[in-house]
């Protein structure tokens, strides 16, 4: 079915198609015809961060920034859905156009800039959702006009407001589309920010009587030395997990493409190699007690299996869905299942 819808979506501007696709998804969900888009994969239970996931294939943050489509997205077969990135106050993001397909390379360039309706709107949407399946992650960020020295206040505001509703929370310090945000990945800044957030997490755990896991999402453009430094800090502060990686500002393999000069983060197939290299390096430098989610460039089941081989416990999709549609979810689940069941695969990272 998606093969029939895709040409119509690709005739539209990428951001308009994004909205149209989500509206079509909701319509199919409400009318009971979502099964025509993709069949739900058989369960492949996976344990991570103290949570039980129906399967290890999730939706990455960015597709549903405000949590308006949670139930429909779960119905596509994802084991978990991550919504956001959300900020304390609503913000419009960067000027349009700000989203570009690169079909020749199965890539997408975006400079959205954390456009979202604000954390209060997201909280209301989450409360209105049925949430009768899967694990819900909420990705939090800072407003663009909040200076880095006060960034912790934005993250703590979001952490507190979403804590009771999230199954896990992701701290996004790696988007290239908010000026200066990636500076928070530098060793000292990272230590200061995550220390404050860990304190907030423990305070909220005591208040709510439950501990919600907190993950940190990192960039693929970190040098090896910076990856090592980040790993030291995140291990020292005992974060619950790491997501590797966000989009890249590099244009490897498409340097001469007409869109290569567009500012923003590149996702999809072009980021697969570097993202997986960062994932692999993190796995060798973090204790096994800190699971990794591999995201970046997954356009096939083989790509998902490659992330698992590099040390991921689970994976996330986004740009691959643009080109492959919802069938990619089941394909990735089955590829990971085959890898897990293969005698040579050893013990899966759980």
Curated annotation (Swiss-Prot):
<feature type="binding site">
    <location>
        <begin position="61"/>
        <end position="65"/>
    </location>
    <ligand>
        <name>FMN</name>
    </ligand>
</feature>
<dbReference type="GO" id="GO:0044205">
    <property type="term" value="P:'de novo' UMP biosynthetic process"/>
</dbReference>
<keyword id="KW-1003">Cell membrane</keyword>
<dbReference type="InterPro" id="IPR005719">
    <property type="entry name" value="Dihydroorotate_DH_2"/>
</dbReference>
<keyword id="KW-0560">Oxidoreductase</keyword>
<keyword id="KW-0472">Membrane</keyword>
<feature type="active site" description="Nucleophile">
    <location>
        <position position="175"/>
    </location>
</feature>
<keyword id="KW-0665">Pyrimidine biosynthesis</keyword>
<comment type="pathway">
    <text>Pyrimidine metabolism; UMP biosynthesis via de novo pathway; orotate from (S)-dihydroorotate (quinone route): step 1/1.</text>
</comment>
<feature type="binding site">
    <location>
        <begin position="110"/>
        <end position="114"/>
    </location>
    <ligand>
        <name>substrate</name>
    </ligand>
</feature>
<dbReference type="InterPro" id="IPR001295">
    <property type="entry name" value="Dihydroorotate_DH_CS"/>
</dbReference>
<keyword id="KW-0285">Flavoprotein</keyword>
<feature type="binding site">
    <location>
        <begin position="318"/>
        <end position="319"/>
    </location>
    <ligand>
        <name>FMN</name>
    </ligand>
</feature>
<dbReference type="GO" id="GO:0005886">
    <property type="term" value="C:plasma membrane"/>
</dbReference>
<comment type="similarity">
    <text>Belongs to the dihydroorotate dehydrogenase family. Type 2 subfamily.</text>
</comment>
<feature type="binding site">
    <location>
        <position position="85"/>
    </location>
    <ligand>
        <name>FMN</name>
    </ligand>
</feature>
<dbReference type="GO" id="GO:0106430">
    <property type="term" value="F:dihydroorotate dehydrogenase (quinone) activity"/>
</dbReference>
<feature type="binding site">
    <location>
        <position position="177"/>
    </location>
    <ligand>
        <name>substrate</name>
    </ligand>
</feature>
<feature type="binding site">
    <location>
        <position position="217"/>
    </location>
    <ligand>
        <name>FMN</name>
    </ligand>
</feature>
<dbReference type="InterPro" id="IPR012135">
    <property type="entry name" value="Dihydroorotate_DH_1_2"/>
</dbReference>
<feature type="binding site">
    <location>
        <position position="65"/>
    </location>
    <ligand>
        <name>substrate</name>
    </ligand>
</feature>
<feature type="binding site">
    <location>
        <position position="268"/>
    </location>
    <ligand>
        <name>FMN</name>
    </ligand>
</feature>
<protein>
    <recommendedName>
        <fullName>Dihydroorotate dehydrogenase (quinone)</fullName>
        <ecNumber>1.3.5.2</ecNumber>
    </recommendedName>
</protein>
<dbReference type="GO" id="GO:0006207">
    <property type="term" value="P:'de novo' pyrimidine nucleobase biosynthetic process"/>
</dbReference>
<dbReference type="InterPro" id="IPR005720">
    <property type="entry name" value="Dihydroorotate_DH_cat"/>
</dbReference>
<dbReference type="GO" id="GO:0005737">
    <property type="term" value="C:cytoplasm"/>
</dbReference>
<feature type="binding site">
    <location>
        <position position="172"/>
    </location>
    <ligand>
        <name>substrate</name>
    </ligand>
</feature>
<feature type="binding site">
    <location>
        <position position="139"/>
    </location>
    <ligand>
        <name>FMN</name>
    </ligand>
</feature>
<feature type="binding site">
    <location>
        <position position="245"/>
    </location>
    <ligand>
        <name>FMN</name>
    </ligand>
</feature>
<feature type="binding site">
    <location>
        <position position="297"/>
    </location>
    <ligand>
        <name>FMN</name>
    </ligand>
</feature>
<dbReference type="InterPro" id="IPR013785">
    <property type="entry name" value="Aldolase_TIM"/>
</dbReference>
<comment type="function">
    <text>Catalyzes the conversion of dihydroorotate to orotate with quinone as electron acceptor.</text>
</comment>
<dbReference type="InterPro" id="IPR050074">
    <property type="entry name" value="DHO_dehydrogenase"/>
</dbReference>
<feature type="binding site">
    <location>
        <position position="172"/>
    </location>
    <ligand>
        <name>FMN</name>
    </ligand>
</feature>
<keyword id="KW-0288">FMN</keyword>
<dbReference type="Pfam" id="PF01180">
    <property type="entry name" value="DHO_dh"/>
</dbReference>
<comment type="subunit">
    <text>Monomer.</text>
</comment>
<feature type="binding site">
    <location>
        <begin position="246"/>
        <end position="247"/>
    </location>
    <ligand>
        <name>substrate</name>
    </ligand>
</feature>
